[in-house]
Amino acid sequence: SLDEEKITGAYRFKEDEFFYLGHFPGRPITPGVILIETMAQIGATAFGIYLMACQKKMRPSEMDKALSLFSSVDGVEFKGIVDPGERVIVKGNKNYFRKGVLKVETTMERENGEIICWGTLMGVVANL
C-alpha cells in the first residue's frame, strides 16, 4: 500500500542469492546490510519517488526522470534473522519530506507480523 504518509512493500529473498554462499556456509542467513538495503529501496527510494511525483504532479511517463538516493541510516536494530526463501514486509512511515529530503521510520517484519529490524532512513530525491 502507498499514500503520502506511509508505504508498505514486500520482497522474497531468493534461495540462490550470491551472498548466501559465504554468509554462512552450512547455515545461510541474509546479511544485515542487505536487510538495510531492502528497507531503503522500499522505505526511502520508492517512497521518495512517489512523494516527489505527488508534490510536482508528475505523470507516470515523467517518473523515469526522478532520481532517488538512499543517503543515511540511523539507529537500525535487529531482532531476528532472515532465511533464504523468506518473504519480508517493509513498512515506512514518513517523518518529513522537505526540499527533496525524506526521513522515514522503517520496519521489516515477517509475514506473521513478527518484527525483524527497524530504524530511521533518509533519502534524497531529485528531478533530472
What does each model-found stretch correspond to?
Residues 10-12, 77, 122-124:
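Generic structural detector for well-ordered beta-strands
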Residues 4-6, 81-128:
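HotDog/MaoC-like acyl-thioester-processing domains
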Residues 1-30, 34-35:
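Catalytic strand-loop segment that frames the active site of acyl-thioester-processing enzymes
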Residues 2, 73-76, 119:
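Generic beta-strand hydrophobic packing signal
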Residues 30, 34-51:
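Active-site- and interface-proximal helix/loop "cap" or "latch" segments in soluble metabolic
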Residues 44-89:
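Hydrophobic beta-strand-centered segment that forms part of the acyl-chain substrate-binding groove
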Residues 14, 45-48, 97, 111:
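Charged, amphipathic alpha-helical interaction segments
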